[in-house]
Structure formats: structure tokens, C-alpha cells
Amino acid sequence: MSNQETQVSSLPMPPERYIANYTDENIRRNRAPRPPPPPAQHEVYSMFGIQYNNDEMIRSLESQNIKRLIPIHFDRRKELKKLNHSLLVNFLDLIDFLILNPDSPRRTEKIDDISLLFVNMHHLLNEFRPHQARETLRVMMEMQKRQRVETAARFQKHLERVREIVNTAFSALPVLDDDDDSGGAKIKTEVDPLEANAAAKNDPSYQHDRMLCKLVDAIE
């Protein structure tokens, strides 16, 4: 069993495995597992079954026991052109050897030279990766900033439009005087005399007044 390879998943565990460890009860009782500490310098760590270390991502050619064809201080553009020209010349030489003398030991030497040129060229290109990553991040952040500025400008434009509509609506409202009762206009109504006489006859005091008037008329 010890000789069997350990099966390691290439994907993280399902969320339920983490949720069970970080419940409210575990957090309240300080039972939730703490995150692992960052690896120390030059420490090897495993992630999804693959070994990693904290060494520089782009190691020098000398540390890999590879012959360096480019100087320490150089112009990358010029050196890339030189390597490209050397690669083309060696490739043409290899073709000549394959045509004239395929069994010549120089054929193997040319293949090794071409391989070494490719390694140096790729190493030189890989040294641009940090700069490329920074430039990509800068472009991405500038794009996000521009999108946010445009969104804020559109929001401000719509806000000004809404304010204009609200101000126009307030301006269209009628202006009322302070003397108006309950904010409404006074309405004058006139009562028909016939309706007034009919209402008076139904009043009990009207009958008493009428009897008194008849008595006064009889005395006279």
C-alpha cells in the first residue's frame, strides 16, 4: 500500500466541507481552523498534488547549468535579433549537413546549438513576463477606471434630467393665496327663495310666529 501513488484531486473540496468547519458555533467557540501560514522562503509546498517552491519563477541560466549566450547587461531587442539570426544560420547549416552528409557528427552538434539558441531565446522572452504582467494589470485597471467614470457620468446626466423634470413639475403647479381657506377657492352659493320659504314653513317656530301675527291683526 505504501508503494501506491496517492490520489490527489486536481480541484478543491466541495463547499460543504469548508462550511462544516466554519459554522457560527465553531467561530463563536474559536474552534474554526485557522488559515495555514504562508510558506517560508525556499520552502517547498504542495498544492493539488504538485510541488511548488518560493524561488524565483525565472531562474538564471547558470543556476540551471545552461550555457549563457547573452551578456549580463544588454539590449534585449538587439540580442533577440542576434539570436534569431544565429538560429536561422544554424538551421541552414543543419539542412546542408542533412543533404550532404546525414551521418556526420556535426549534425548532432548543430541540433544541440539550435536547442541552446532556443533556450536562451525563451529565457530572454520569459524575462519580459513580469513587465508583461504589470502592463496587463495597468491596462485592465485603466479600463475599469474608464468604465466607472463613464458610468458615473451617465448617472450624473440622468440625475440632472430627473431634477429638471421635477423642477418643471413644481413650476407647473398653481400658486395659491394665503387667504384661501384650506388651500381651496371660496365658493359662493345662492339659495332659491322658494326653497327658503318651503324650508321656513316646516320650521315649528314659524307656526308660532304666524299665530302671534294673526292675534295682533285681530286686536287692531
Swiss-Prot record:
Subcellular location: Nucleus
Pfam families (UniProt xref): Med7
Transmembrane segments: none
Main localization, broad class: nucleus
Molecular function via GO: transcription coregulator activity
Keywords noted in UniProt: Activator, Nucleus, Transcription, Transcription regulation
Cellular component GO terms, alphabetical: core mediator complex; mediator complex
Gene3D superfamilies in the record: 6.10.140.200
UniProt-listed GO biological process terms: regulation of transcription by RNA polymerase II
Subunit structure: Component of the Mediator complex. Interacts with MED21.
Family: Belongs to the Mediator complex subunit 7 family.
Function, in words: Component of the Mediator complex, a coactivator involved in the regulated transcription of nearly all RNA polymerase II-dependent genes. Mediator functions as a bridge to convey information from gene-specific regulatory proteins to the basal RNA polymerase II transcription machinery. Mediator is recruited to promoters by direct interactions with regulatory proteins and serves as a scaffold for the assembly of a functional preinitiation complex with RNA polymerase II and the general transcription factors. Required for activated transcription of the MtnA, MtnB and MtnD genes.
Name used for this protein in its record: Mediator of RNA polymerase II transcription subunit 7
Organism: Drosophila melanogaster (Fruit fly)
Lineage, uppermost ranks: Eukaryota, Metazoa, Ecdysozoa, Arthropoda, Hexapoda
